[in-house]
A protein has these predicted regions:
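Glycine-rich phosphate/pyrophosphate-binding beta-alpha loops
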Residues: 154-157, 177-187
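Acidic, Mg2+-coordinating active-site environments of NTP-dependent enzymes
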Residues: 11, 17-172, 194, 198-201, ...
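C-terminal helical cap/extension that packs against the catalytic core
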Residues: 177, 201-204, 210-276
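Switch II (G3) loop of P-loop NTPases
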Residues: 1-3, 173-179
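Conserved nucleotide-sensing/catalytic segment adjacent to the nucleotide-binding pocket
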Residues: 1, 7-11
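Glycine/threonine-rich flexible loop motifs
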Residues: 29-36, 185, 213-217, 289-291
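A glycine-rich beta-strand to alpha-helix segment
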Residues: 268, 272-296
Length: 299
């Protein structure tokens, strides 16, 4: 969705029984003045949910109350999920690492249970909570296999990790190059910072976040503060808008500005050493994903 009316048009065709709004952020924001306008555009899905249908909302989102009030007027069944808001129907209570997986303890409509998940990344946890909330409409969640989420494979370009062999070096490539917006980039950076490595360094290659319109400069600059508070070693950028990010990070974290795709190859070839990690994040239209996909064949 990048403009008012798109969700209204599509949801009138579908006439869904269950709708989900995961979050409100500055993705595809070029045609909106502010986040509230985006929230109202997304609320179009509530207006077209069938009578006596259900709406699933993120209780941690800043526009939860707005969407809830619209759903009340539509007389829909409202279900919520969250990590911070403990009034949510389905909420995370705790998460604890056990060997190579994490035990997520969850309250589901006042019933306490748990599931094993592969990582403790917040965006992953929120997606799981949203999924469980939808499932709870149709079945008894307490009877689900505790390892049901362990088989989930991260889609290509959405944070999948590849071990590649290049120039006699073992490198770890975290591919986030399918898309980029302020919220997903923040999540990816914080997830990258959480990864514990015994050897090697962490490098970050960023491309432009596109379709942000007049919000672009401010939102790119805001990423600098997030990066400065991480243990990521060096930042490299390619693009015009992402220069606002590069100019906002501390001097010690600055790698360099890349001007073409061949310099991306040179970065991987010359700057990375054995056991180093490189995370790549950019909007799909930048074309950086094509370069990264070529390296993922070097396993």
């Amino acid at each position: 969705m990048d403009k008012k009316g798109e969700i209204d048009y599509l949801s009138k065709i579908v006439k869904q029984d269950v709708s989900v709004i995961t979050n409100i952020n500055y993705a595809h924001a070029k045609n909106f003045k502010n986040l509230r306008q985006i929230a109202l555009a997304k609320s179009e899905i509530i207006n077209n949910t069938r009578v006596n249908g259900s709406i699933v909302l993120n209780a941690d989102d800043d526009f939860f109350a707005l969407h809830k009030n619209i759903a009340i007027k539509r007389k829909l069944k409202i279900l919520s999920f969250g990590i911070v808001n403990q009034n949510a129907n389905i909420k995370l209570i705790s998460i604890k690492q056990i060997s190579n997986k994490f035990k997520a303890t969850i309250i589901i409509n006042n019933f306490k249970t748990y599931f094993f998940i592969s990582n403790n990344f917040q965006n992953n946890i929120l997606n799981i909570l949203a999924t469980l909330t939808v499932l709870s409409i149709f079945l008894d969640i307490s009877k689900l296999n505790k390892n049901i989420f362990m088989g989930f494979k991260t889609p290509n370009g959405r944070g999948d990790i590849s071990k590649i062999k290049f120039n006699n070096k073992n490198l770890y490539l975290i591919d986030e190059s399918y898309n980029s917006n302020p919220l997903s980039l923040k999540s990816a950076i914080l997830n990258f910072d959480k990864i514990k490595i015994k050897k090697g360094k962490k490098y970050l290659l960023l491309g432009d976040m596109l379709e942000l319109g007049k919000h672009s400069k401010r939102l790119h600059q805001s990423i600098g503060k997030i990066i400065n508070n991480t243990k990521i070693d060096k930042i490299f950028v390619k693009g015009s808008e992402v220069l606002f990010t590069y100019n906002s990070i501390s001097k010690k974290k600055k790698g360099r500005v890349l001007n073409n795709n061949s310099q991306i190859i040179d970065l991987i070839k010359n700057d990375l050493n054995n056991n180093d990690y490189l995370m790549v994040k950019a909007s799909n239209a930048t074309g950086i994903n094509k370069i990264i996909n070529s390296f993922k064949g070097s396993k």
